[in-house]
Regions:
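Accessory nucleic acid-recognition modules appended to NTPase machines
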Residues: 161-321
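Conserved lysine of the Walker
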Residues: 29-30
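Short regulatory helix/loop adjacent to the ATP-binding pocket of P-loop NTPases
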Residues: 107-122, 139
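Hydrophobic anchor at the beta1->P-loop junction of P-loop NTPases
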Residues: 21
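Domain-level recognition of nuclease-like catalytic cores that cleave nucleotide substrates
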Residues: 138, 358-385
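Conserved catalytic/switch belt of AAA+ P-loop NTPases
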Residues: 84-107, 115
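Pre-Walker A adenine-sensing motif
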Residues: 1-13
Length: 385
């Protein structure tokens, strides 16, 4: 099986500091580290013997340190948060040692009193595959498949993606949530997940979601926080720095992978031209943009909507690049209204419509780009530097 080269490269980071590498299960953290750091010492906290030993006596971590300049990978660091105190001590005693601390959940790491190394480690998040990684591989990039089955590496490689998505969601419910001891009511959480999937890319109405999932409003809020903590979803903040029109201030919520969303929704087919296809296309572009922003420092992703709801722009990068997604082969005047309205509120370097037109063109200062052309410009660095 081909090992697909990942865009995220930890080696430049490790020249300066240690690193947290966070990401949901099966996003490829282990494969990335094996490819980039083949000589690193690996400590797997999913190994019960190692887990019990280091949980009982975190100072035994020093037994794994053999020489200066060593790189030590600790997998699933959230299982033994007190181990971070020993990591801190070892970094202080030998400035040449580097740790890579992986985690599939940030929940226990965010608790009060957990040592996050006080700036001695940078943090990176690994996403499922992106266009630039698949396009350059033997597998290649298949947009319809990505919209339906997502980009989790094990699903991309799979000959039975829907069956494997079923297993993935089941494993998440049984293992990740149970391991975190985050909720004891798995049937209610399962109902909530299905309801939440229908809210992907939307502003959340906790009362309605709670009613649909047959849980309290406060429980729905807590469950969304659990999704964030276990890296299964994240917020897209609203852009608020407008000149005249008041803007919506509430975030939208996105799951980390579109295949998980489609499985939870029960979607088995996506027909072009349908609202469902349009939603999926927009969510996929969000995946690409969120991944790009996380892999490159100092970039902010948001969306803009006027408070009266009349105008909206799907994505804003750094406040000066506005991007609209349209699953159409022919962009018309109605498709550019949101970009034009937003241009009156701030100074923009780029206004872009990502669509299915056959070739790039420009209309009234707006770049109309075929989706593949847009992604090539994004990942090559031609769009944002």
């Amino acid at each position: 099986m081909e090992t697909i080269k990942r865009h995220l490269d930890l080696r430049p980071i490790l020249k300066a500091k240690s690193c947290f590498l966070l990401g949901p299960r099966q996003t490829g953290k282990t494969s990335l580290l094996e490819a980039q750091l083949p000589d690193a010492t690996r400590i797997d906290l999913l190994d019960d013997e190692i887990f019990l030993r280091l949980q009982a006596k975190p100072t035994m971590l020093r037994d794994y340190i053999k020489h200066s300049g060593q790189v030590v990978v600790i997998d699933e660091i959230q299982r033994v948060p007190p181990l971070l105190n020993e990591v801190h001590r070892l970094i202080e005693s030998d400035k040449s040692i580097r740790f890579v601390l992986t985690g599939s959940s940030a929940r226990k790491l965010r608790k009060k009193g957990v040592n996050l190394l006080g700036g001695r480690a940078r943090s990176r998040r690994l996403h499922p595959f992106v266009w630039a990684e698949l396009q350059g591989s033997k597998i290649g990039f298949d947009l319809p498949r990505s919209l339906l089955y997502g980009s989790i590496p094990s699903i991309v490689y799979s000959d039975a993606p829907r069956d494997d998505l079923k297993s993935y969601v089941g494993d998440y419910l049984k293992e990740e949530i149970a391991m975190e001891a985050a909720t004891r009511n798995l049937p209610a959480f399962s109902r909530f997940l299905e309801t939440a999937a229908h809210c992907n890319g939307q502003i959340l109405n906790f009362q309605k979601i709670g009613n649909d999932a047959q849980v309290k409003r406060s429980t729905a809020q807590n469950y969304f926080e659990l999704l964030r903590d276990t890296l299964l979803g994240s917020d897209l903040p609203a852009y608020k720095k407008t000149r005249s029109r008041k803007a919506t201030t509430t975030s939208k919520f996105y799951f980390f992978d579109l295949g998980v969303v489609q499985y939870l929704r029960g979607v088995r087919d996506l027909a072009k031209g349908t609202p469902l296809f349009g939603e999926a296309f927009e969510a996929y572009i969000h995946h690409e943009l969120a991944s790009w922003c996380d892999y490159h420092s100092d970039h902010e992703l948001s969306y803009w909507r006027s408070q009266d709801g009349r105008h909206e722009v799907d994505f804003i990068i750094n406040g000066d690049v506005a991007i609209e997604c349209k699953s159409t082969h022919a962009v018309d005047a109605g498709d550019i209204k949101g970009l034009n309205a937003f241009a009156l509120e701030t100074t923009l370097r780029h206004r872009i419509i990502v669509c299915f037109e056959p070739r790039p063109r420009r209309v009234s200062g707006i770049e109309i780009l075929p989706w593949a052309h847009f992604l090539e410009k994004l990942w090559s660095g031609d769009l944002i530097r």
